[in-house]
Curated annotation (Swiss-Prot):
Residues 178-197, 304-396, 483-544, 566-662, 745-794, 817-907, 962-1035 are annotated as: Disordered. The modification Phosphoserine is found at residues 322, 352, 383, 567, 624, 692, 696, 748, 862, 951, 979, 1009, 1016. GO terms for biological process: actin filament organization; cell surface receptor protein serine/threonine kinase signaling pathway; protein localization; regulation of cell shape. Residues 179-189, 522-531, 566-579, 633-643, 745-763, 976-990 have a biased composition (Polar residues). There is a cross-link at residue 405 (Glycyl lysine isopeptide (Lys-Gly) (interchain with G-Cter in SUMO2)). InterPro entries: Paralemmin (IPR004965). It is a lipid-anchor; GPI-like-anchor. It comes from Homo sapiens. Residues 490-505, 533-544, 817-829, 865-886 have a biased composition (Basic and acidic residues). The gene is PALM2AKAP2. It holds the Pfam family Paralemmin. The RII-alpha binding site, predicted to form an amphipathic helix, could participate in protein-protein interactions with a complementary surface on the R-subunit dimer. The lineage of its organism: Eukaryota, Metazoa, Chordata, Craniata, Vertebrata. PANTHER family: PALM2 AND AKAP2 FUSION-RELATED, PARALEMMIN-RELATED. This is PALM2-AKAP2 fusion protein.
Length: 1103
């Protein structure tokens, strides 16, 4: 059925349907009205009946009138009901009609769709039915005046155009998704390049493209055809196939093109729809036969300048897998050019392994061409007058010429395809990867644009909010920072600015250097393209070079700058922010590990040093990376000394949280000084150096055997915060007198930054000697001498590290010597009060340190060299070292008899105060941890005033406590020999240091009476005494021993830091309570205190 008729019928159907629909709508409206009327009438009738019921009978006329009225009403109701029924039926019929019409319309629509099926689908169908079908394009040559009979064997070389063979062209005739046509004997895809009918510029493009093709191997020209284009070609070809119904060997007269010419139908062949199948199938079959025939023999027979004339109607494309194809456009005989009106459609075909000649040749005898022109040169000049390009595929000298004439179907082409051939710049494809060219506007233009943009925004804002204009046009006069600051701050602000400028200048210089280096490297290295591209793009290169080098300079310069930051320690030294001194036995530095690593790792371990065991905790005798180990047994003390200077200073973060700063063994004592350098420039995370000078693990840890336990688990945050805080103090106080800092740091740092655990004060015989020996063997010079040496040390960092290590070792030596000396002289000393000893020792240590601290103030200005941190570390260390005297024996089994009571008693005060300090610190640290972020903000560190005050108060309190304790101890010793009758007399709990809730400063209750106090403790303590001595232990001792036993049992469970800290505080409290409970008479204060403790702690004790 003709398409037009179908359209007409469909339109009629649609009109009918519309008509029915309007009718239905009208009827529905009527129906609704009728229904309303009916309801109204019914209700009216009902109402009247109801009203009339109670009315007394009137005259006969009235009765008659009423009856008539009611009848009328009833009739109307009935009428309405009939109407409604009728309307409903009509609507029903109309709807059924409408549905029939719409069904009919649907059928018509489907028929139309069938006729409108794209010819691509037909083509698909045909090619799939024919197993070996090739996609063909047969084209009309509408007005070619010359007639020639077609010869079965065309001459391949005819138009002199040759194509260098290209491998495996993509099939262009099929849409991208479809497979390339597979001819059985010729499995090569075809390529069509089409020219739009009237566009001369397209001719030119084709010609120039021919040149390009011959110049370089091209990708399949498929890219030059858009999918629409391809589909269009297929449709066209099918249309034309149909219009050339049979292709026979007899020539068709070209004078009568109408015989084959079918006018374009916009892709729909309405009239010939039915016959299309047969015609197309016939043509395809015929062409296949021709191809098979040609495939065998034509290649041999074809001459280069034979005079064969094609059948004008159809052209066969044969493709095969073949060597690369180049196309060249070729001038054609002028007689043809003149007579031709529609530019031809050009087909590319790959020659099959036995190249095939075309089944048809376009009219005319092509001029004979010498073989060499056709052969390898592959490029023939294009004559400007020629409107046709013919392509030949050459393989081993045999050519297949394909010239196709195409009738104009331009309405189907993709409109932009002619203007923008996608192949135009294909040759430069490899260059694209080489260059990245960005369009950058000149800065003036940008400024201009920005200005305009702002103006626009302003104008809009002013429109919306006129009040805003006043602000803009009369901005408030802002004061500069300089005006706002007072003199003190102004000065520091200026200094800060100067520093900033200096730094910026240095960075600029660096960048310039880098840029110069970059420019010296020829940019061509960076963007070397293949030589061919260089030849082509030599001009472009000149233009591109600037852009490219600029980009490369920037990114490369940045990279190099970053790299240099690592190596540039010396340069950056002066500008870094103050550094932290953190005591870090077991926690990571604040900065990320990575921030430390690049800087600290480069230090090579000294050759002689013992092997490093970086991951594990420093087990006895093993050296953890930063630790100076002094294996006195191994006898490598000298080594260690050198190592002290050059050894690897690895950051604590690297050596893992478990490492101990003192690994102690019978034979070894290793002190560790860890110098952690965090490069501020790179990672502004930490201060320039966070040095952890961890000399001597907290003595408590060693003594109490808590090493792994508490080192591992005590809240690291506490330490971190505190150490940072105190290091801040240190820095800010750097100008202050050493004594002040020392006083500050002495207890607070020691106690703060190290895990606080009780320590038995039993001297360890072997250890004292070992330590002192190994350290004294080191032969470290005094800090001041080292400072003197400093110029000799090439790298300031190494110098710092050396100082650090020496200090560590020196201090350890001092401790050990001190310990050894004090062992002998201690009884007497402690009679005078341990406080004295502690202070003496500290004084002694400070004596050794003072030269150093004297040295420091000049260095403080460059934070990198600031050596201050050694003080805090050493102070705590000494503090601890003095207290350190015991090995980690859970019970004091090795106590030598003799006046050890003195020694034991000494730690009592410090032991307890240490506990409360630990608690206090935990609480303050937890506060501090939250504040820390503020503390570290900006280039300056602020130390918390609260912290400082607290530490001073604690010191005073502790000093007082210790003095009291000393007196008590003396009294106790005197009383210990008194009559056994007093044994049961409980003394007041005055001697106990009350463990208060964390953060509260402990109170020491002075003993009301010396008599009751001391002896009362002896009975309970005596049973616990170890074999060495029958002397009574004081409360402190007992508690510590309890603690030790308890701890050794539960060491495994201690890893959780919160658990540990809780346990420490709870345990101590409970033990204090137990000890207190022994005493019969308790002061009101004691009772109250105990009650409070019980209330707070009982649950925890039960854990």
């Amino acid at each position: 059925m003709a398409e037009a008729e179908l359209h007409k019928e469909r339109l009629q159907a649609i009109a009918e349907k519309r008509k029915r629909q309007t009718e239905i709508e009208g009827k529905r409206q009527q129906l609704d009205e009728q229904i309303l009327l009916l309801q109204h009438s019914k209700s009216k009738v009902l109402r009247e009946k109801w009203l009339l019921q109670g009315i007394p009978a009137g005259t006969a006329e009235e009765e008659e009138a009423r009856r008539r009225q009611s009848e009328e009403d009833e009739f109307r109701v009935k009428q309405l009901e009939d109407n409604i029924q009728r309307l409903e039926q009509e609507i029903q019929t109309l709807e059924s009609e409408e549905s029939q019409i719409s069904a009919k319309e649907q059928i018509i629509l489907e028929k139309l769709k069938e006729t409108e099926k794209s010819f691509k689908d037909f083509q698909k169908g045909f090619s799939s039915t024919d197993g070996d079908a090739v996609n063909y394009i047969s084209s009309q040559l509408p007005d070619l005046p010359i007639l020639c009979s077609r010869t079965a064997e065309p001459s391949p070389g005819q138009d002199g155009t040759s194509r260098a063979a290209g491998v495996g062209w993509e099939n262009v005739l099929l849409k991208e998704g479809e497979s390339a046509s597979n001819a059985t004997e010729t499995s090569g895809p075809d390529m069509t390049i089409k020219k739009p009918p009237q566009l001369s510029e397209d001719d030119i493009w084709l010609k120039s493209e021919g040149d390009n093709y011959s110049a370089t191997l091209l990708e399949p020209a498929a890219s030059s055809l858009s999918p629409d284009h391809k589909n269009m070609e297929i449709e066209v070809s099918v249309a034309e196939c149909k219009s050339v119904p049979g292709i026979t060997s007899t020539p068709h007269p070209m004078d009568h093109p109408s015989a084959f010419y079918s006018p374009p139908h916009n892709g729909l062949l309405t009239d010939h729809h039915e016959s299309l199948d047969n015609d197309v199938a016939r043509e395809i079959r015929y062409l296949d036969e021709v191809l098979e025939a040609n495939c065998c023999d034509s290649a041999v027979d074809g001459t280069y300048n034979g005079t064969s004339s094609p059948e004008p109607g159809a052209v066969v494309l044969v493709g095969g897998l073949s060597p690369p194809v180049h196309e060249a456009t070729q001038p054609e005989p002028t007689e043809r050019t003149a007579s031709r009106q529609a530019p031809p459609h050009i087909e590319l075909s790959n020659s099959s392994p036995d190249p095939m000649a075309e089944a048809e040749r376009t009219n005319g005898h092509s001029p004979s061409q010498p073989r060499d022109a056709l052969g390898d040169s592959l490029q023939v000049p294009v004559s400007p007058s020629s409107t046709t390009s013919s392509r030949c595929s050459s393989r081993d000298g045999e050519f297949t010429l394909t010239t196709l004439k195409k009738e104009a179907k331009f309405e189907l082409r993709a409109f932009h395809e002619d203007k923008k051939p996608s192949k135009l710049f294909e040759d430069d494809e490899h260059e694209k990867e080489q260059y990245c060219i960005r369009k950058v506007r000149p800065s003036e233009e940008m400024l201009e644009l920005e200005k305009e943009r702002r103006e626009l925004i302003r104008s809009q804002a002013v429109k919306k909010n006129p009040g805003i204009a006043a602000k803009w046009w009369n901005p408030p006069q802002e004061k500069t920072i300089e005006e706002q600051l007072d003199e003190e701050h102004l000065e520091s602000h200026k200094k800060y600015k100067e520093r900033k400028e200096r730094r910026a200048q240095q960075e600029q210089l660096l960048l310039q250097k880098q840029l110069q280096q970059q420019q010296q490297q020829p940019p061509s290295q960076l963007c070397t393209a293949p030589a061919s591209s260089h030849e082509r793009a030599s001009m472009i290169d000149k233009a591109k070079e600037d852009i490219v080098t600029e980009q490369i300079d920037f990114s490369a310069a940045r990279k190099q700058f970053q790299l240099m930051e690592n190596s540039r320690q010396a340069v950056a030294k002066g500008q870094s922010t103050p550094r932290l001194f953190s005591i870090k036995p077991f926690y990571r530095p604040l900065g990320s590990v990575n921030s430390d690593k690049p800087l600290t790792n480069p230090r090579p371990p000294s050759v002689g040093g013992p092997p490093e065991d970086s991951g594990a905790s420093a087990a006895k005798g093993q050296k953890s990376p930063g630790a100076l180990e002094t294996p006195s047994a191994a006898g490598s003390q000298g080594n260690t000394a050198s190592q002290g200077k050059e050894g690897p200073y690895s950051e604590p973060s690297k050596r893992g949280p478990l490492s101990k700063l003192w690994a102690e063994d019978g034979e070894f004592t290793s002190a560790r000084a860890v110098l952690t350098v965090v490069k501020d420039d790179d990672h502004g995370i930490l201060d320039q150096f966070s040095r952890s000078v961890n000399v001597s693990l907290t003595q408590e840890e060693l003594d109490s055997g808590l090493d792994e336990l508490s080192v591992r688990s005590q809240d690291t945050t506490v330490l971190e915060t505190l150490s940072n805080d105190f290091s801040m103090d240190n820095i800010s106080d750097s100008g202050a007198s050493n004594e002040t800092t020392n006083a500050l740091q002495e207890n607070s740092l020691a106690d703060f930054s190290l895990p606080q655990t009780p320590q038995t004060d039993n001297p360890s015989e072997g250890r004292g000697e070992g330590v002192s020996k190994s350290f004294s063997d080191h032969g470290f010079y005094s800090p001041s001498s080292t400072l003197g040496d400093s110029p000799l040390v090439d790298d300031p960092l190494e110098y710092q590290a050396g100082l650090l290590v020496q200090n560590a070792i020196q201090q350890a030596i001092a401790e050990q010597v001190d310990k050894a000396v004090s062992k002998t002289s201690r009884d007497g000393a402690e009679q005078q009060g341990p406080e004295a000893t502690v202070e003496e020792a500290e004084a002694a240590a400070f004596g050794s340190e003072k030269p150093q601290s004297m040295f420091e103030p000049p260095q403080v200005s460059s934070p990198v060299q600031e050596k201050r941190d050694v003080l805090p570390k050493i102070l705590p260390a000494e503090d601890r070292a003095l207290r350190e005297r015991g090995p980690p024996q859970p019970l004091p089994a090795v106590q030598p008899s003799g006046p050890i009571n003195m020694e034991e008693t000494r730690p009592e005060g410090s032991y307890f105060s240490k506990y409360s300090e630990a608690a206090e610190l935990r609480s303050t640290a937890s506060l501090l941890a939250t504040q820390e972020s503020d503390v570290m903000v900006g280039p300056f560190k602020l130390r918390s005033r609260k912290q400082r005050t607290l530490s001073m108060i604690e010191e005073e309190i502790r000093a007082a406590q210790e003095r009291e304790e000393e007196l008590k101890r003396q009294r106790q010793v005197l009383q210990s020999t008194q009559s056994p009758r007093t044994k049961n007399a409980p003394s007041l709990p005055s001697r106990t240091c009350y463990k208060t809730a964390p953060g509260k400063i402990e109170k020491v209750k002075p003993p009301p009476s010396p008599t009751t106090e001391g002896p009362s403790l002896q009975p309970d303590l005596a049973p616990e005494e170890a074999a060495g001595t029958q002397r009574p232990k004081n409360l402190m001792q007992t508690l510590m021993e309890d603690y030790e036993t308890h701890k050794s049992k539960r060491r495994e469970r201690m890893d959780d830091s919160s658990y540990t800290s809780k346990l420490l505080s709870c345990k101590v409290t409970s033990e204090v309570l137990e000890a207190t409970r022994v005493n019969r008479r308790k002061s009101a204060l004691a009772l109250r205190w105990e009650a409070g403790i019980y209330a707070n702690q009982e649950e925890e004790d039960n854990e």
